[in-house]
């Protein structure tokens, strides 16, 4: 009777646990419930490469869950069934131990092999699928070269050649056409970095003196967060970038803008030294490691990025002339390129069309007056 009572109680608790588990699994359909829909979510994916990797994760989870339940059930049964219930049973001599049961041992080995095969098949398929663009889609592939520096990313577009300037180059914001496979050649000029856009593809390392690559695709236009995923020095944690996927027309318009020289504005007739000075807003005090990135936008992140593509509204030619003079005076041109103005530095990120970017400082800060002032004064 006592055993029956124990088993009945165990059954009651098991039903309660299963009910809680069922509610949890159903709730998982809503990514917000588990806070799995963040900027770097690997669960709410938006591309075929990340989707194939997520499928492997799910298969592995289900297989291990089944194993966990079976092993746990046998362990629970043995613990209840053969528990010593009296002082005499606690002091009893254990029964004679045998060498084992060949049938059970062979069965367990077979079950283990089966579990590994179930995991291995989708894993191998995903490895082959994610290694390179599928043959039937290679004709539609767009190619980009990503180069890691301490601590920023450079993106070159080999198919977009600019007369006298080589391939189109940008920094920290990778703009791609949505709905097309993108092959990204991975390079580094210093240490090992790792290129990772969680919603679009798993990470792949950038290794010195070694050519590496990955491919990804954004199914729809969108704004995605990327990150270096390999410790690469003091500022590794803030080595970030963005991926912006655009529709065909928007992407072609962006290419047209980016392959053009940086605009030149006629200087004012007054001397630069007499030009009005920049009036900056009061700078807030940032805590250590606070990024300054807005968590919520009044509009979508993609629309916020698009708003940066036409930054000429309200421009002041006098201030532009003053800034250009300061750019020369402070020797910014020794590191940074501004195409069309004779500034051809190569060691730092290109600043051509800098105003069209939504971020600065390695995609750590928003590109606005306050954050730009903060960055220039204390990089």
What is each of the regions a protein language model found here?
Residues 351:
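"…together with the soluble PPM/PP2C metallo-phosphatase catalytic core" -> "…together
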Residues 30-59, 79-334, 340-346, 363-379:
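Non-transmembrane, membrane-proximal soluble domains of secreted or membrane proteins
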Residues 1-32:
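N-terminal secretory/membrane targeting signals
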Residues 66-85:
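Alpha-helical transmembrane segments
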Residues 24, 74-77, 122:
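Transmembrane alpha-helix boundary/anchor motif
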Residues 356-359:
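Exoplasmic/lumenal beta-rich domain surfaces
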Residues 53-72:
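Hydrophobic single transmembrane helices highlighted by the model
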């Amino acid at each position: 009777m006592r055993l029956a009572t124990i088993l009945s109680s165990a059954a009651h608790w098991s039903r309660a646990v299963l009910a809680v588990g069922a509610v949890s699994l159903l709730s998982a359909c809503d990514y917000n419930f588990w806070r799995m829909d963040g900027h770097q979510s690997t669960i709410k994916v938006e591309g075929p490469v990340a989707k194939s990797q997520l499928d492997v994760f799910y298969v592995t989870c289900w297989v291990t869950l089944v194993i966990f339940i079976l092993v746990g059930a046998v362990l629970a049964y043995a613990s209840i069934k053969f528990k010593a219930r009296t002082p005499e049973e606690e002091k009893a001599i254990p029964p004679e131990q045998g060498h084992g049961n060949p049938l059970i041992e062979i069965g367990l080995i077979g079950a283990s092999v089966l579990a590994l095969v179930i995991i291995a098949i989708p894993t191998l398929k995903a490895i082959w699928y994610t290694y390179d663009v599928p043959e039937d889609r290679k004709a539609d592939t767009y190619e980009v070269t990503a180069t890691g520096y301490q601590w920023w990313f450079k993106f070159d577009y080999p198919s977009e050649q600019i007369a006298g300037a080589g391939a189109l180059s940008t920094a920290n914001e990778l703009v791609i056409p949505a709905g097309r496979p993108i092959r990204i050649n991975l390079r580094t000029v210093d240490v090992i970095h790792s290129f990772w856009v969680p919603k679009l593809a798993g990470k792949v390392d950038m290794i010195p003196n070694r050519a590496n690559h990955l491919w990804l695709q954004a199914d729809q236009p969108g704004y995605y967060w990327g990150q270096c995923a390999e410790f690469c020095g003091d500022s590794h944690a803030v080595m970030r970038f963005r991926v912006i996927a655009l529709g065909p027309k928007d992407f072609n318009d962006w290419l047209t803008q980016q392959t053009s020289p940086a605009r030149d504005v006629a200087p004012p007739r007054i001397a630069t030294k007499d030009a009005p000075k920049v009036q900056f807003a009061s700078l807030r005090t940032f805590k250590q490691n606070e990024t300054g990135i807005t968590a919520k936008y009044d509009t979508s992140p993609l629309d916020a990025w698009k708003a940066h593509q036409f930054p000429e509204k309200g421009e002041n030619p006098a201030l532009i002339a003053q800034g250009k003079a300061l750019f020369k005076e402070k020797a910014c041109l020794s590191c940074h390129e501004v195409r069309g103005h004779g500034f051809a530095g190569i060691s730092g990120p290109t600043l051509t069309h800098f105003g069209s970017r939504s971020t600065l400082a390695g995609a750590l800060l928003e590109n606005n007056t306050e954050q730009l002032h903060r960055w220039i004064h204390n990089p």
